[in-house]
């Protein structure tokens, strides 16, 4: 998908702000208490997702995340299909005080390619 320059600049800034983690570390992190957060729309989540992941679509994230994940110390692994929405979500969560919000580098596509 071709993105507008302004959107891509925002996504690049988000990737610089939030840590991107390797897809190969996702399962171990989940086993150690991290939450995989699928920020894609529910129809995308229904088709394929990381097993055990929580689904909060990007458009509702900031409105409901505190009810779903009240602990600001929780490691949260945001993901979309690739990078941008995951990184934007992780950066937004960091702004909200979630100190361990990260994104899965390469998103679900990279995770499934393992």
Kindly give the residue locations of the regions a language model identified.
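Rhodanese-like catalytic fold shared by cysteine-dependent sulfurtransferases
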Residues: 1-35, 42-75, 81-114
């Amino acid at each position: 998908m071709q993105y507008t320059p302004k959107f891509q600049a925002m996504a690049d800034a988000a990737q610089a702000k939030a840590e991107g983690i390797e897809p190969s570390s996702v399962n171990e992190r989940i086993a150690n208490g991290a939450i995989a957060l699928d920020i894609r729309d529910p129809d995308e989540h229904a088709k394929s997702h990381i097993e055990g992941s929580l689904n909060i679509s990007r458009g509702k994230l900031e409105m409901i995340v505190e009810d779903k994940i009240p602990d600001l110390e929780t490691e949260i692994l945001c993901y979309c299909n690739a990078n941008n929405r995951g990184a934007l979500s992780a950066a937004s969560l960091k702004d909200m005080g979630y100190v361990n919000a990260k994104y899965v580098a390469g998103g679900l596509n990279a995770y499934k390619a393992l």
